[in-house]
C-alpha cells in the first residue's frame, strides 16, 4: 500500500471531514454573532461525494475519520453519511464532534449506523454562562446528550473545553471534579487565533499550565495515563481515584506538528493538510478521477509545512507562511 507521507516523514492515516459550515450556536471563539454567509446547499459535499472520496482514501492508508462542522448533526442525512462510511471495511474508527444539542435524539441511530465515539463541546457547567458563551445553547440538552451517548455505548466520550480567560477559567476545578464519578475524558484546549484578525484573541488566551495550578490549589493529586483511544495530541492525566481523565491540548504554546497525522476536508470540498495555513485544494472536480484526485491530495501533503508557527502570534513575530483567515466553522472544528 502506498501511504500518504510528507517530506518530513509524517504518515497521514486520519482525516477530519466537515459536512456543513452551518451551526445552531454562535460560540464566541468560533463564529461571529451575526453577518455570516453560509454555503449554498449545492456547494456542500453530498453523502455520495464523501463516501466516494473515502473509498479511495482508504487505499492509501486513511483508517480514521472524524466528522465535524459547523454542527454535523444539522445534516438531515448525517446517519446515512455515517452508515456509508461504516460500510467501508478499512475504516477502523468513525467519530464525530458535536455541540450535542441534538445528540440525545440521534445517538442511538448514529451508533447503529457505525459511529464509534463522540467528542462534545462543553465550555461551562453553569447554564447561564454556557448560554452566553454559545450565544443560545442549553446546557441541559448537552448533559442529556452525554447521558444518551453513555447509554448507547459511544465510548470514549470526550468533552472539549476551550479555556477562555475571564469567562470559564474559574470552572477548571468543577470540570476536574466531573471526572471523579464519570468515565469521561475532559480535554482543555487553548484558545486559538483561527480566523481572528488582530491581537484581540490574546485577551482571552490562557496557557494550560493553569490547569495544573488549579489541580495543585485544589489538592488534587494526578498522574499521567496511557493513550486514550483516538486521543490525538492530548496529554492525558487522571486525578487519583477518579473514574475519568483529563487532558490538555496546546496548539499555540507547544505545537504537536512533528507527530501530525491528519488531513482536513472542508464542507465545500477543499483538502487542507494544515489547519493553520491558507493553502487548500479543491477535490470536487476530480471525485470521479482517482488518479488526478490522489495526485492532488499528495500535492497538498507535499506542501505541508514542518510546523504552523502559531506560537509566534503570542510574541507578535513574523510568520513564514500565511495563516488561515477562514473561521473554524468554515474549516471544520
UniProtKB/Swiss-Prot annotation:
Residues that bind GTP: 16, 66, 97, 158, 262-264
UniProt cofactor(s): [4Fe-4S] cluster
Species per Swiss-Prot/TrEMBL record: Listeria monocytogenes serotype 4b (strain CLIP80459)
Domain Radical SAM core: 7-221
One Pfam entry name: Radical_SAM
Its job: Catalyzes the cyclization of GTP to (8S)-3',8-cyclo-7,8-dihydroguanosine 5'-triphosphate.
One MF term in the entry's GO annotations: GTP binding
Stated name of the protein: GTP 3',8-cyclase
Residues binding [4Fe-4S] cluster 1, per UniProt: 23, 27, 30
InterPro entries: Aldolase_TIM (IPR013785), Elp3/MiaA/NifB-like_rSAM (IPR006638), MoaA (IPR013483), MoaA_NifB_PqqE_Fe-S-bd_CS (IPR000385), MoaA_twitch (IPR010505), MoCo_biosynth_MoaA/MoaC (IPR050105), rSAM (IPR007197)
Family: Belongs to the radical SAM superfamily. MoaA family.
Keywords: 4Fe-4S, GTP-binding, Iron, Iron-sulfur, Lyase, Metal-binding, Molybdenum cofactor biosynthesis, Nucleotide-binding, S-adenosyl-L-methionine
Subunit-level organization: Monomer and homodimer.
EC number(s) on file: 4.1.99.22
Enzyme class: lyase
Residues bound to S-adenosyl-L-methionine: 29, 70, 121, 192
GO biological processes: Mo-molybdopterin cofactor biosynthetic process
Cofactor note: Binds 2 [4Fe-4S] clusters. Binds 1 [4Fe-4S] cluster coordinated with 3 cysteines and an exchangeable S-adenosyl-L-methionine and 1 [4Fe-4S] cluster coordinated with 3 cysteines and the GTP-derived substrate.
Catalyzed reactions per annotation: GTP + AH2 + S-adenosyl-L-methionine = (8S)-3',8-cyclo-7,8-dihydroguanosine 5'-triphosphate + 5'-deoxyadenosine + L-methionine + A + H(+)
Record-listed [4Fe-4S] cluster 2 binding positions: 257, 260, 274
Keyword Nucleotide-binding: yes
Pathway assigned to this chain's UniProt record: Cofactor biosynthesis; molybdopterin biosynthesis
Amino acid at each position: 500500500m502506498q501511504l500518504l507521507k510528507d517530506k518530513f516523514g509524517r504518515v497521514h492515516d486520519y482525516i477530519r471531514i466537515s459536512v456543513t459550515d452551518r451551526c445552531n450556536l454562535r460560540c464566541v471563539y468560533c463564529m461571529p454573532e451575526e453577518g455570516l454567509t453560509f454555503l449554498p446547499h449545492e456547494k456542500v459535499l453530498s453523502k455520495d461525494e464523501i463516501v466516494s472520496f473515502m473509498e479511495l482514501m482508504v487505499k492509501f492508508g486513511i483508517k480514521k475519520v472524524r466528522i465535524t462542522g459547523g454542527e454535523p448533526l444539522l445534516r438531515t442525512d448525517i446517519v446515512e453519511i455515517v452508515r456509508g462510511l461504516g460500510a467501508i471495511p478499512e475504516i477502523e474508527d468513525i467519530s464525530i464532534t458535536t455541540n450535542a444539542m441534538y445528540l440525545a435524539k440521534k445517538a442511538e441511530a448514529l451508533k447503529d449506523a457505525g459511529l464509534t465515539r463522540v467528542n462534545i463541546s462543553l465550555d461551562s457547567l453553569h447554564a447561564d454562562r454556557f448560554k452566553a458563551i454559545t450565544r443560545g445553547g442549553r446546557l441541559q440538552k448537552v448533559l442529556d446528550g452525554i447521558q444518551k451517548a453513555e447509554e448507547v455505548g459511544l465510548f470514549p466520550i470526550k468533552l472539549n473545553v476551550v479555556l477562555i480567560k475571564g469567562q470559564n477559567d474559574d470552572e477548571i476545578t468543577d470540570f476536574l471534579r466531573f471526572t471523579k464519578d464519570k468515565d469521561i475524558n475532559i480535554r482543555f484546549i487553548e484558545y486559538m487565533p483561527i480566523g481572528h484578525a488582530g491581537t484581540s484573541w490574546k485577551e482571552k488566551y490562557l496557557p494550560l499550565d493553569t490547569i495544573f495550578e488549579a489541580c495543585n490549589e485544589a489538592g488534587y493529586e494526578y498522574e499521567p495515563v496511557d493513550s486514550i483511544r483516538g486521543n490525538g495530541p492530548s496529554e492525558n492525566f487522571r486525578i487519583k481515584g477518579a473514574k475519568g481523565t483529563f487532558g490538555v491540548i496546546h496548539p499555540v504554546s507547544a505545537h504537536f506538528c512533528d507527530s501530525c497525522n491528519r488531513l482536513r476536508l472542508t464542507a465545500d470540498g477543499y483538502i487542507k493538510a494544515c489547519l493553520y495555513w491558507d493553502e487548500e485544494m479543491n477535490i470536487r472536480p476530480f471525485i470521479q478521477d482517482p488518479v488526478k484526485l490522489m495526485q492532488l491530495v499528495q500535492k497538498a501533503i507535499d506542501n505541508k509545512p514542518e510546523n504552523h508557527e502559531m506560537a509566534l502570534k503570542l510574541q507578535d513575530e513574523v510568520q513564514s507562511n500565511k495563516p488561515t483567515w477562514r473561521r473554524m466553522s468554515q474549516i471544520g472544528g
